[in-house]
């Protein structure tokens, strides 16, 4: 272990609980974005973002309008994004200044469950509790919105935005091209999709489920393989080349090859 950062120890006086609710890292591991929610579930809950270097030295902190629900960071750390329960998607520059916020049509009644940014910073994706998947330009112009079959649990986007993916609580994975056309919808109504990951080119996609499975798909949405890990798969990630997939279930981290278990 290189270091730990105790966000609760850095919380202002009067905050009784601080939880990590978003985490991202840049390409070379020199910048870490952490999203915290203070006093979650209370009337005073609030969100704050930290950008740290790899020592860890805090480069900046920025408060946002509501609890943090997921965070993303571009490869060069020039673009940071966060989703919030206040119904907004936030985009920040490398100095922690909020460049823009995009409000969902329902505002606070349409919480943003998750947000991510493409590695090159050219696309921001987000998913809402009210079953919408949103793609935005760097200037917060909405390119398209997809209505999904259930609340969005996770999203992923390739480097250039040529492929994006969403996983829903209703058990569906949607794979889309850069025009918002659904290439394929893969349905597993017997479970929920909890985690999504995609490689740089969009040629390899991974999904983790509540019933303990990891699925891998190609860029056309054709399933390459699946493996059962046991407990709920809460996170997955795919490396740039698509030949390594990591997944977490319970207190265990699994490393899989891109070709399967």
What residue ranges belong to the model's regions?
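A short beta-strand motif characteristic of beta-propeller blades
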Residues: 1-13, 57-62, 97-105, 141-146, ...
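Short glycine/acidic-enriched loop and turn motifs that connect beta-strands
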Residues: 38-43, 87-88, 131-132, 171, ...
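Short glycine-/Asp-/Thr-/Trp-enriched loop segments that recur within the blades
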Residues: 10-19, 106-111, 191
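Short loop/turn segments that connect beta-strands within beta-propeller blades
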Residues: 52-57, 93-97, 137-141, 177-181, ...
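Blade-level signature of beta-propeller repeat domains, shared across WD40, Kelch, NHL, RCC1
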Residues: 227-261
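Residue-level detector of Asp-centered blade-edge/turn motifs that repeat once per structural unit
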Residues: 27-28, 75-76, 119-120, 159-160, ...
């Amino acid at each position: 272990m290189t270091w730990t950062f105790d966000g609760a120890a850095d919380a202002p006086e009067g905050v009784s609980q601080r939880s990590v609710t978003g985490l991202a890292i840049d390409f070379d591991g020199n910048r870490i974005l952490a999203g915290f929610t203070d006093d979650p579930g209370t009337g005073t809950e609030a969100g704050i973002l930290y950008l740290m270097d790899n020592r860890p030295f805090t480069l900046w902190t920025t408060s946002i309008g509501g609890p943090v629900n997921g965070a993303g960071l571009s490869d060069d750390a020039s673009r940071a994004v966060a989703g919030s329960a206040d119904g907004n998607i936030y985009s920040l520059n490398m100095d922690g200044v909020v460049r823009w916020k995009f409000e969902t049509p329902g505002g606070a009644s349409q919480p943003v469950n998750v947000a991510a940014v493409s590695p090159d910073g050219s696309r921001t994706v987000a998913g809402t509790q009210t079953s919408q998947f949103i793609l935005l330009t760097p200037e917060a112009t909405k390119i398209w919105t997809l209505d999904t079959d259930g609340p969005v649990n996770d999203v992923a986007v390739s480097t250039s935005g040529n492929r994006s993916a969403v996983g829903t609580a209703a058990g569906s994975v949607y794979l889309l091209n850069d025009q918002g056309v659904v290439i394929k919808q893969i349905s597993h109504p017997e479970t929920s999709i909890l985690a999504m990951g995609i490689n740089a080119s969009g040629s390899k996609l991974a999904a983790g489920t509540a019933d303990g499975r990891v699925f891998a798909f190609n860029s056309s949405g054709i399933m390459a393989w699946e493996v059962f890990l046991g407990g709920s798969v809460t996170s997955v990630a795919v490396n740039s080349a698509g030949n390594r997939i990591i997944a977490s279930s319970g207190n265990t981290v699994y490393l899989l090859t891109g070709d399967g278990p």
